[in-house]
């Protein structure tokens, strides 16, 4: 008789868990940001924009040097080129980390 009671109790517990799981929302909304805060997407977009600006400035400086514009030194061109290169490499590493994090999350068991 105790097996029947334990089984009934187990079934009641399972039904209660099922009802609780069905009543909770499947997805949660993103938290609201306080005024003055920026989201990760905004910060990433700003970083991409800065890398683009650095590359554009480097390219313009190199073009100015190539056509012989006065006031443009080779050292300035090389420094701008290296800054653009380093910023692009950093952005590439951030992208690689994001892709790896996404893949790790997708491979997690449910």
Swiss-Prot record:
Transmembrane segments: none
Any one GO MF annotation of this record: structural molecule activity
Superkingdom of this protein's organism: Bacteria
Keyword line: Bacterial flagellum
UniProt GO cellular component terms: bacterial-type flagellum basal body
An individual GO BP term: bacterial-type flagellum-dependent cell motility
Localization, UniProt: Bacterial flagellum basal body
Presence of keyword Nucleus: no
InterPro entries for the chain: FliE
Similarity section: Belongs to the FliE family.
NCBIfam families assigned to the protein according to its UniProt record, in alphabetical order: fliE
Name listed for the protein in its UniProt record: Flagellar hook-basal body complex protein FliE
């Amino acid at each position: 008789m105790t097996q029947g009671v334990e089984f009934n109790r187990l079934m009641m517990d399972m039904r209660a868990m099922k009802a609780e799981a069905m009543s909770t929302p499947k997805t949660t909304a993103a938290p609201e940001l306080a005024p003055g805060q920026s989201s990760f997407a905004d910060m990433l977009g700003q970083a991409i924009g800065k890398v683009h600006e650095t590359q554009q400035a480097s390219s313009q400086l190199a073009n100015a040097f190539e056509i012989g514009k006065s006031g443009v030194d080779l050292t300035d061109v090389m420094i701008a080129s290296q800054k653009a290169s380093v910023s692009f490499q950093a952005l590439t590493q951030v992208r690689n980390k994001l892709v790896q994090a996404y893949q790790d999350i997708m491979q997690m068991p449910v």
